[in-house]
Amino acid sequence: MSNTSEDNITVRFVTENDKEGWQRLWKSYQDFYEVSFPDDLDDFNFGRFLDPNIKMWAAVAVESSSEKIIGMINFFNHMTTWDFKDKIYINDLYVDENSRVKGAGGKLIQFVYDEADKLGTPSVYWCTDESNHRAQLLYVKVGYKAPKILYKRKGY
């Protein structure tokens, strides 16, 4: 187990130098959800995170004492017909298994909340698998479970 504590964790936007650490967690995230994406999608997404003209971002949780990236969150801005203000969708959130329950997940979500407020888009939402009970223990502390059911187009 890591010695990571909430006070020892900083969250910041990714930089070009973070690609390897972000990619390591991105691959672990895919393993967790038993999915696999092509490697060139990593480059494509990371490029979008760094492009100031694209409203898609990534942030990382860094263990201050070791400078190790222990968590990542990917999020983007979109319009809605339900409000004049845009919304923020958290697309992906992952914390290294050895660093969980130390505050990184909550700090990553709070980072998105803070950025959403700065953008004037305070509405932030995300979804998770019904079976991801451990994550839901955090999510009910930082948000609420919406009474919605997600449907998807068959085959996609």
Curated annotation (Swiss-Prot):
Biological role stated in the UniProt entry: N-acetyltransferase that acetylates histone H3 at 'Lys-14' and histone H4 at 'Lys-5' and 'Lys-12'. Also acetylates polyamines like putrescine, spermidine and spermine, and certain other small basic proteins like nuclear HMG proteins.
Residues binding acetyl-CoA: 93-106
Name under which the protein is recorded: Histone acetyltransferase HPA2
Stretches assigned to the N-acetyltransferase domain: 9-156
Taxonomy, superkingdom: Eukaryota
Record keywords, A-Z: Acyltransferase, Chromatin regulator, Transferase
EC number assigned by the record: 2.3.1.48
GO cellular component, one term: Hpa2 acetyltransferase complex
Gene Ontology biological process terms, A to Z: polyamine acetylation
Biological source species: Saccharomyces cerevisiae (strain ATCC 204508 / S288c) (Baker's yeast)
Gene Ontology molecular functions: histone acetyltransferase activity; identical protein binding; N-acetyltransferase activity
Catalyses which reaction(s): L-lysyl-[protein] + acetyl-CoA = N(6)-acetyl-L-lysyl-[protein] + CoA + H(+)
Site (Important for catalytic activity): 139
A matching Pfam family: Acetyltransf_1
Alphabetical list of InterPro entries matching this protein: Acyl_CoA_acyltransferase, Diverse_Substrate_AcTransf, GNAT_dom
PROSITE patterns recorded: GNAT
Posttranslational mods: Autoacetylates in an intermolecular reaction.
Protein family according to the UniProt entry: Belongs to the acetyltransferase family. GNAT subfamily.
Subunit structure: Forms homodimers in the absence, and homotetramers in the presence of acetyl-CoA.
